[in-house]
């Protein structure tokens, strides 16, 4: 169950609305940020499980591993297949955004993944880094502008706070 204590930064009515998944069907995004252990991955996966229960196609990727695989895909010819798989999902969950530096090719690949989804699929991006720092993290101003335009103009932001939920008794 979701913990709705005052220090968590979660609004029960907003979560209930998000769990109806209208935003997924509309191809909108959710950006989930917060410190380590605040439940970003758990919340993102709750939306993913709910979407799967509604018969929607869901894909989950840790950003650094996805980009590593795509970099290999440039060399072994699997890049198009990887991008097509991600583009076909109704909901793509990109977890641990901002944990490792983006390479120039990683920035471009991330932009392509997000661009493939505009108007056709919803994306959740979860990470510790506040959204206000994403532009600087991406580094390349043109790519950063393009990525931010694709994810934030039609997105809901959830900022989780409070102490770590790991090891907390239920």
Residue ranges and their predicted role:
Residues 10-88, 135-138:
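Conserved P-loop
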Residues 91:
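Walker B motif beta-strand of ABC-family P-loop ATPases
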Residues 1-12:
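Charged, amphipathic alpha-helical linker segments immediately N-terminal to NTP-binding catalytic cores
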Residues 6, 34, 162:
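Flexible glycine-/small-residue-rich
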